[in-house]
Amino acid sequence: MVKVPFLFIVFFLIGACWAVVHAAGSGYPDRPITVIVPVPPGGSTDIGARLLAQFMEKQLRQPVVVVNRPGAAGTIGGYALSSAKPDGYTLGYFPSSTAVPEIFSYFYSAPYSSSDLRPICRVHVPIITISVKVDAPWNSLKELVEFARKNPSMKFGHIGKSTTQYLMIKTLANAENLRIVDVPFDGDGTMVPALLGGHVPVATPVLSVIKPMLEGKKLKAFSVWLQTRAPSVPDIPAMPEFGYKIPYVPFQGFYAPKETPDEVIKKIDEVVRKVTEDKEFQDKNKAMDMVVEYEDTTLHEKYLLRYKTNVQVFLREEGLVKK
């Protein structure tokens, strides 16, 4: 009586293991791959994922389908990936806050953590700006700060309290003792129209999203979240020039569910590496002011550890930790 269920369990486990190994075998991929993006269409993470998918399809010879799962500061998409079958057919292209949600527990409790994901590689480093409409009455960050000091409750747009955009605002507000109202959006795709429409006077969009609007004289940017000025926009000062600390920079990269086989991780990492070396891919990124800084799996895993430490120290200094 005991042997039947025992054998059933043994065969079931063998079958399950075979299915996962088969998925990662030499025939991978043999069907379309889904890439979850945790923000709405139109933002830098979405744009980067779609451009990568276009070039990855050429090498994988299978469709790479980008699916937007926005909401809850990116944790809806993050949880969807952590809960997906680890067979290599569901991946995620995530910003840093979605990749390591546990370090932002001061702002929310995520239903997963970075331990539920496997890093594959880093690809993009977004350039975040402090921007206003071109007809705004301020012509520099200094003028904006002076106005905000005299006018408490000024609205600043960002894309979630776990994001670098929000921390950029908090850095400014804390350093200058400003009383502001932060207004969260699901992503650049919804925040930028709100800025253009005058619903928020100040916002923190990524440069690659608003570059056409800067050139078209619809927006103006006062600063970038970088240690030094961006080569593509040398007239825009970096935050340290105003005396503000930049302890880390955000990133975007590929992730997979925790139990995804090594063969899949290696395959996707190798494909992405080749894509980032493609001159056409590089030229398209440059044209959109998207910075490509590829890191393979091993390097990205090490970087994540440093990133967590740096962010936690920064949040502690800013008083953004639970007591």
What annotation goes with each model-predicted range?
Residues 30, 57-61, 176, 231, ...:
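A short C-terminal helix-loop "cap" of Rossmann-like NAD(P)-dependent dehydrogenase/epimerase domains
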Residues 24-116, 153-154, 161, 165, ...:
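N-terminal (or domain-start) structured segment
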Residues 1-30, 322-323:
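Short, low-complexity disordered leader/linker segments with a strong preference
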Residues 97-107, 170-175, 202-234, 312:
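A ligand-binding cleft/hinge motif common to bilobed small-molecule-binding domains
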Residues 40-42, 96-97, 128, 133-138, ...:
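Short coil/turn segments
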Residues 30-32, 174-178, 262-323:
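An extracytoplasmic/periplasmic, membrane-proximal ligand-sensing/linker region
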Residues 24-25, 116-120, 236, 240-245:
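Short beta-strand/turn micro-motifs at beta-sheet edges
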Residues 80-89, 103-190, 239, 251-284:
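Hinge/capping helix and adjacent helix->loop/strand transition within the periplasmic-binding protein
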